[in-house]
Amino acid sequence: KQHIVDGDVFQVVISQRLDIDSPADPFDVYRVLRTLNPSPYMYFMALTDAQGRDFNVIGSSPETRIKVDNGHAMTFPIAGSRPRGATPEEDEKFAKELLADPKECSEQIMLVDLSRNDLSKVCVPQSVEVVQLMDIKRFSHIMHICSTVTGKVDPSLTAFDVFKSAFPAGTLSGAPKPRAVEIIDELEPADRGIYGGTVGYFDFSGNMDMAIAIRTAFLRDHEASVQAGAGIVLDSVPATEWQETRNKAEASVE
């Protein structure tokens, strides 16, 4: 928080990694994750690193980093969270608390502005707009505040240009992004690896769909690593932010 007091950043997203033994078959882990935490983006990847070691990336991401469809760019910043309630009444209570939390709402507005700035670099002037602001999006274990920002891509640019303008995600780094990334490098004890990256595709029609690699497990040699973070702002309460990282990691750890 001292970096925020000093004026270096408005927000920085600090994460922690959980390493656990995982003797199960990786594809069985994926099948269980699909049941426990169905999300807009589900993926199972069997890969080999530069040293010839096999590993798997398994995820159920709720968040789009950037999408291009028929010349239109879309991004859906997510910020703020509460656990799901045990009853419909408790669930609604948590949702109302989330939308009434000044810290969570200010964080969401900041990330919406960051998304608008990202798209304004690659979209037709005055085409960028916020079409949905501060909706509650529910998942199996957690709920978030979500907004939608869109724009018409400059005809002289490609989906690769759009991706470059929007990476890394402000929701996984902070604002301003360049300084937030430097602070993350200073404070986090290990490289993030796949966490906070993207999983998705570019097609031959100029379209693109990229999920942020969150709620994602990295498996190698019967060990699984799951990483989750929380956005730190001036009035953040450390214990609350720590609990948010645990809530986010819960489905992947299970």
Give the positions of each predicted feature.
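Extended alpha-helical targeting/anchoring segments
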Residues: 1-254
